Amino acid sequence: MNQKQHKRSAFSGKIGFVLSAAGASVGLGNIWRFPYLAAKYGGGIFLLIYIILAFTFGYTMIVAETALGRMTKKSPVGAFASFGKTGGLSFGGWINAIIPILIVPYYSVIGGWVIRYLADYIGGHGSELAADGYFSAFISSGPSAEICFAIFTVFTLSIIFAGVRNGVERVSKVMMPILVVLSVVIAGYSVTRPGALEGVKYFLVPNIANFSWMTVVTAMGQMFYSLSIAMGILVTFGSYMKKDVSIEESTENVEVFDTAIAIMAGLMIIPAVFSFSGGDPDTLQAGPALMFITIPKVFESMGLGTVVGILFFTLVLFAAVTSSIALTESAVSTFEDELGWDRKQATILIGIIMLVLGSLSALGYGPLARFTVFGMQFLDFFDFLTNSVMMPIAAITTCLLVSRVIGVEKIEAEVTLDGKPFRRKRIFNFMIKYLCPIFAAIILVSSVANALGVISM
């Protein structure tokens, strides 16, 4: 490893960290995945379980990863290696570092889809987006999907070139407040549609009759998507955090911000779908197709559908961008630390990786459709590998590092550097030692079992 030293970047303060970390968390996992999972797994009961997990499981992992990063001032590989270079510790650091490198290419492909939809709405082609077969025709087109992916990738890389404070932080400070305003406006419009209040009730009021074990497992899995845990981002962002910034308060800000946006996303989509379909179960459980196939049909049935479509896909684009720059920044930080490269060199390398792996996903439903990995298209395979296998393993290794190697006392010392008490210390200690690794193991086993057809999620 090249040990050439470089001056470590830093956020300007608490607001910079919170908005950047919230930007990393508030991505397609909130706007796209959360609403369709809530619709599929019982609405209000899913939301209740998710909130409980966010303020226990999610909170613990955010504190642990952020403290680990700030304590070592290193990206995941170096952070883990700071406490020993045994095989297990080295593996934990590398798996946390590799995850964003594998996610951001296919994530950028989906970001490219969002660009295409936004452009079509701006061009007044909303009725075409609502037509049957539009989405499948677009993603199988090859060149069109590749161009949109390339545009999104270049935009992401241009922000990373600008650095942590002038790029990641500045963009997050601009986009996140706009995202909040757009979510409130769209949710307000959605819940006032005829028949939408039934959707509000379904989403917000827990119904124990809708409870199942899979509701809990799925809500656990959503934690990884929604809070950006176990993918190296929070370790990296923690390494950019100043010592006088409160880790616990910042974590609370991030979890509240993230959960609020997830709820707003549910209020944007579920009531609108109820208004459109009358609560038809098949429509509610459309899964990933909900945003790109069902929602355009919903907007087409509304008054001001084109305007709402523009606002909605602008919001989704902002969410995708803030998350993609966080993923890319984590990868760049790893290359800088482990290879001793400067930001320009590291950004060019991740750019090449994004274009190569992303092109496989962008073309995987078209010219490369006949090539699959374990029966999955490239995008689906990378998504399964990272989110269902690698991230739970990364979470387990982080829990073991903190609880068995570093010791919770050192984490507490890092958290209280600002002079304030660690208010949820008991919850943190219990979760990181016992429940968090168990939860991560459950997610890993259930995800693999689902892929093998043993269970159905």
Give, region by region, the residue ranges found by the protein language model.
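Helix-loop-helix connectors at the membrane interface of multi-pass transporters/channels
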Residues: 2-4, 78, 111-140, 241-244, ...
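A generic transmembrane alpha-helix motif of multi-pass inner-membrane proteins
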Residues: 379-400, 423-457
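Membrane-interface "cap" regions at the ends of multi-pass membrane proteins
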Residues: 1-32, 61-66, 70-83, 87-91, ...
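Membrane-embedded translocation segments of transport machinery
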Residues: 2-7, 11, 169, 173-321, ...
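Transmembrane helix-boundary motif of multi-pass solute transporters/channels
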Residues: 13-53, 238, 249-252, 256-259, ...
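Inter-helical loop and helix-membrane interface segments of multi-pass membrane transporters/permeases
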Residues: 5-8, 36-41, 76-95, 108-165, ...
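Extracellular loop-to-transmembrane helix junctions
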Residues: 38-64, 144, 390-394
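Select transmembrane alpha-helical segments in multipass membrane proteins
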Residues: 10-21, 45-49, 87-101, 147-152, ...
